[in-house]
Amino acid sequence: MIETIQADWIKSEAINLENCCNDNPLKILGPHFYEEQWVIRVWMPEADEVKINFKNNTYKAESINHKWLFEAILPENPNHNYEINILRGGVTHTQHDPWSYREEWMGEVDRHLFAEGNHHHIWEKMGAHLIEEKNQKGVMFCIWAPNAKSISIIGDINSWDGRHHPMQKRLGGIWELFMPSMQEGDTYKYEIRTQQGHIYEKADPYGFLHEIRPQNGSIVSKLKNFNWNDSSWISNRDSSSQINKPISVYEMHLGSWLHESTDNKYLENNGDPRDPVPAADLKPGTRLLTYPELTKKLIPYVKERGFTHIELMPISEHPFDGSWGYQVTGWYAPTSRFGTPNEFREFVNKCHEEGIGVILDWVPGHFPKDKHGLAFFDGCHLYEHGDSRIGEHKEWGTLIFNYSRNEVRNFLVANLVYWFEEFHIDGIRVDAVASMLYRDYLRPDGEWIPNENGGNENIEAVKFLQQANHVLFQHFPGALSIAEESTTWPMVTKPTDMGGLGFNLKWNMGWMHDMLDYFEIDPWFRQFHQNSVTFSITYNYTENFMLALSHDEVVHGKSHLLHKMPGDDWKKYANTRALLTYMWTHPGKKTIFMGMEFGQRQEWNVWDDLQWELLEFEPHKGIRNLIDDLNVLYKNEPALWKNDFDPYGFQWIDCNDKSNSVISFMRRENDTNEWLVVVANFTPNTHESYKVGVPMEGFYREIFNSDGSRYGGSNKGNLGGKETINYNIHDYQNALELALPPLSVSIFKHQSKK
């Protein structure tokens, strides 16, 4: 061995490699041209012997200055065209040299865009990618961790020993390593040594697949290997604004909609049973449905109900079922509880085939403190703020993203693009927007920091939301972006170029609270609370509102919708039908949570599934029939959706009959002759000849009655419709003399002929 190449720095570098403190392994490892000869240095912990195979010759590598650092001299430049034979513990195996691949994976333009916060496809560079480099297949790893002292790939490939595969630090805090010996399905993590010497094992923030809980490693997975057949759907979606169409959303949690017996195993395509993922301790012997099973069972169910969209509570990978998915650790991976990314793609694909859009809950407001996640990622507060007064939700036990950091915003904005591009989703609902907008959200005085202007607005979060929505609609003009924003923050659904946040829909939390408060009141006392029903119209046109009865209203002791209602069972059913019908006739898009469509009795519990056995009883079938028919009516009557955000589409007839708790109003399309008359009676009293003024004489067909026998009601009504009478009331010369069933909503449509 030539002594001149055995310098002291080699020993020093080898010690750093052993101690996982080397951020520049390419400086010493791989092929080097030194003193007119080609030298290959190989780092092989625990190896007994190392040889180099090159051009049908074998060259023994000698240990130099360290027992695990081996060196061989080759007669010419080997490039990548050599293999390493390793004898370890009596077993020999052959592999390619990871450190023979020296080219940068993340180019200058990529780094620049990422540092700016404008790399909208950063997932195509970050994370683990199956590629072919110099005719050799393998996995390219790339991660951002500027403050780390060293990073290694750990996994089954090296017995989870970080001494084997140190990564190369590049410009911009990027770390890279090509692993020719790894393949699809391999599990891995990043072992990060901090400047203080602490070691963290982190899952891949950009990982496309992760292990099933309670394990939390990342899994190498192909990205673009799915054949979509929804091009017509996507083209139609992006050709026009979706908010001017009927939108009726079924919000649901995949893990608690329906469970299956563990005895009934899901079979893979090859006939092998898949290992079941237990559902919960509440029902021993049950398991979660897989994405393919949900494709076969959920999609036909939602289609039969007539909903236009499914909204999925978060399916990004999360470690704890009890978080409902809102504490995300795997932002770029559909949870593996239900199957593979491609199986989820097929779920979306099938939804589109059946005319159903898919909305995902997206959680850019906070993240959990799990050790394998983003928290203190490289030994510093990389993704979160360092000061807990702005970087932590103590009540939730989660951390807040540092939106002022370009790379963090890039991580989130690209994640938004990722779900639309890679999984063809149609919309997002952004969770807990208010917690992002206000620095003092759920914080007492002294535990928050004012902004640069002395206010409580989180200016950085505002800019992030504006950027996210701007980029989203730039790429996907037909997308839905829905804000769960519970305050009166202005211009939530106004365009960003007008100073708005850029969403195109906002949950109407005020309507929801008012209506639930109202319907929980004994009907005899509702006359004193009429304003709760009518107030929403006074602000209805300040935003593009979506009416939502969500999961948040059926947990934590709040009871499910049916059991919020006062009175005996008959009144509970009737009140529920009346509320749902009123919701479908009120301006705004619609969302209800699973179980409401058939009158679930128990509170929602993430560990359980729905009370499907209730459908054996007629009143529950009746509520389901009501939802089915409301969705058909809703889609067939443009007056119920076409002018949701235009005052032209709504007009009170009478909202002041407090003593009877009756309200009446009209909905209309652009054609002024297309009026729908809606009359709601929110007491158990029946009115036999209640007069309602209408703008045009003629016959008004009763097109819906929530008291119909098909829905479990008393079947009181108007025998199919009513002819107007000449009677001056409500500022109209014509009137309808109607029978108003108890606790009901009736809908009438003017027809020129009977």
Curated annotation (Swiss-Prot):
GO terms for molecular function: 1,4-alpha-glucan branching enzyme activity; cation binding; hydrolase activity, hydrolyzing O-glycosyl compounds. Keywords: Carbohydrate metabolism, Glycogen biosynthesis, Glycogen metabolism, Glycosyltransferase, Transferase. It catalyses: Transfers a segment of a (1->4)-alpha-D-glucan chain to a primary hydroxy group in a similar glucan chain. InterPro entries: A-amylase/branching_C, Branching_enzy, GlgB, GlgB_N, GlgB_N_E_set_prok, Glyco_hydro_13_cat_dom, Glyco_hydro_13_N, Glyco_hydro_b. The active site is at D431 (nucleophile), E484 (proton donor). Pathway: Glycan biosynthesis; glycogen biosynthesis. One of its GO terms (biological process) is glycogen biosynthetic process. GO terms for cellular component: cytosol. Its EC number is 2.4.1.18. It is an enzyme of class 2 (transferase). Catalyzes the formation of the alpha-1,6-glucosidic linkages in glycogen by scission of a 1,4-alpha-linked oligosaccharide from growing alpha-1,4-glucan chains and the subsequent attachment of the oligosaccharide to the alpha-1,6 position. Belongs to the glycosyl hydrolase 13 family. GlgB subfamily. NCBIfam families: branching_enzym, PRK05402.1, PRK12313.1. This is 1,4-alpha-glucan branching enzyme GlgB.
